Amino acid sequence: MADEKVLYEVKDKIAWITLNRPESLNAVNRDMVKSIVEFCHSAEEDHNVQIVIFKGNGERAFSVGGDIKDRARQNAAAAEQSESRLVQRQSKYSAIPGTPAPVIAAMNKITMALVHGYCVGTGLLMSLACDIRIAAEGARLGVSEVRLGFMAGSGGTQRLPRLIGIPKALEICLSGELYDAAECHRIGLVNQVVPYPDLVAAGEKMAGAFLKGAPLALRYIKEAIYKGSEMSLEQGLRYESDLQSMVMQTEDAKEGPRAFVEKRPANWKGR
């Protein structure tokens, strides 16, 4: 297991996806992207999983981003091939994306990133695709692609302004600078900042609070907030009402009040 670059573990309804390449500051190469995507699909299909948490091994970084050496090798290999423009364009949208961010963002389960040290490039894109971000004190986050000659993709220029507003998102993306955890918390990029030794415990604590809720309610709350934010208020209210009506028809919607009256923890069935 020590040789695996991405680790996967399910415990207490939480799926842990861990970047395990500390010697390279968890730089994400193509094989790792493939593994992360596969684990995301596994978690999404597992009825015993309600929350997915991403973290990085090693004390120095959640992830410094994509593996630049790996990218250079891919570029060199591509240059040796005389592909047509159509083939080149099709390859950009292959089954294995450049980052796992689009797959993470598409998950119905609640997702969380526990970031520490460097969280840059692909590392930041992964965390932006999550619902919750908790940072360790001293963490440094940024979008560095512009300094490598290209721009952030996989939602980097789209999710960031939706989280923190256009002016600050422009500053972060255009400068390529790194921002410390305290500043990221101030501007709303991360939900909490905790001491590094407490990072995993903080994630478990928040996940535990979420797990007290009914699984389908969690899912539809997430859907209502994300999809509703792209609608007018009137449309969003109608959408919220439709989802609420669906939730009220579930077994869990009957179990919750019953457990409250009987003064016991609810026994959620997820249906």
Feature roles, as predicted:
Residues 102-218, 235, 242, 246-250, ...:
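Crotonase-fold acyl-CoA enzyme core
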Residues 28, 91, 114-115:
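Structural motif
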Residues 32-35, 96, 199, 240:
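Hydrophobic alpha-helical membrane-association signature
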Residues 3, 258-271:
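Terminal low-complexity tails and localization/encapsulation signals of metabolic enzymes
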Residues 22-25, 60, 65, 138-140, ...:
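A short, glycine- and basic residue-enriched loop/turn
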Residues 17, 21, 35-36, 54, ...:
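Terminal peptide-recognition signature
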Residues 56-103, 149, 232:
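Glycine- (often His-adjacent) and acidic-residue-rich active-site loop
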Residues 1-55, 72-73:
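Conserved CoA-thioester-binding segment of acyl-CoA-metabolizing enzymes
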